[in-house]
Amino acid sequence: MSKSPSGRRDFLNPLKAIKSFREEAADAEIQVPTPTFESVDELEDSCLLYVSKKAMACTFQIYFTPENGDAIAEVAIEALELVEQLENQMTVYRSSPMTYLNETAANEPVRIEPRVYQLLKKGYELFELTDGAFDMTSGLLTKGWGFFRQQGRVPDEHEISDLLKGVGSQHLIFDDQNETIAFRQCDLELNLGGIGKGHAIDRAAEFMTEHGIEHFLIHGGQSSVLAKGKRWLKQSSKPNATEHGSTGEEVPRQKKLYDEVASPHESTDSRDASEPWKVGLRHPTQVENRIAEIGLTDRAVGTSGTGRQSFYHKGKRYGHIIDPRTGQPCEGVFSATAVAPTAAEADALATAFYVMGPDKAIEFCKSNSEYGCVMISPGKSNKVRMDHFGISEDELQIATDD
């Protein structure tokens, strides 16, 4: 790995050619520490512990150091149970407060839970900040293109025009005093799919810090990550305590504490060294490799891409990320990664950056210094291009070209 001297790099593609970047792109995914041990005996040399739970159609995991592992694990398990509660609150796939809001708000204001209200306000702020590239009301377009039920279809121009009439967060009416929301249009629908997972991660992290835990990492489905504090390292470890990842870096083994394995052991590890939590960005065509690593301390990362959620029609591939301003699936980007203070912001901005494309995403980050981006797209001469802004050279390590 080497530091980037500039904000733009091209990477040689080992394939003879990128037939179609939309055909070859891997699913946008952040690589976090992944358990690779095969036996409980190997856990004795662990320097990371984690708990895991399925929610929101993905796996959530919380990583932490072994010191006081038993106590931290109990808190982490409760934090992940909170994620499940939040899913029940925000889902639009079954009866929930959100489905009630969608059914009622065009007729009368609907009072909602205060934290969800604040989340919707944040979503509206990001809608305005991104000039509509992120829009919580774009679910109608997702349905129109068949992604809601994973049955892809291509709507005609007339249908897209009709769908766009029911899209737009400018049609939301917020009443801060009563914490109610109303819709100006009867066909408006809110869907928190682009920000809800990040919100759940933020809430779980908040729960952890309220219980005195300062150093941990949470991810949801490897597309949203929040790191708190530092990753504490052992001063010394046995030779077999690490293994090499696909890019040659040492990847510590971890110990799973929840969902299908074993009870934690006590640890006497000392905290003599630390480093930022490192997450990897997957190469779009070499799925076993990382194209870059980002070091995180008290920051979040979100990544968006269309590698798996797509369909073909008459030989053309359509991805699930739709520009809410045009009603058309986005093209021209492998993946978009956002770095932000919170996971909710990173989640939403990753989608917005994918819609914007590299140039406008970088322009956005230049105007909003609290955010950063990494944009991966097709380059020239069978290369993969990476643009980034708002992430220091100390935080971003880029894979070498060879």
Short names for language-model regions:
Residues 1-402:
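Mature catalytic core of soluble alpha/beta enzymes
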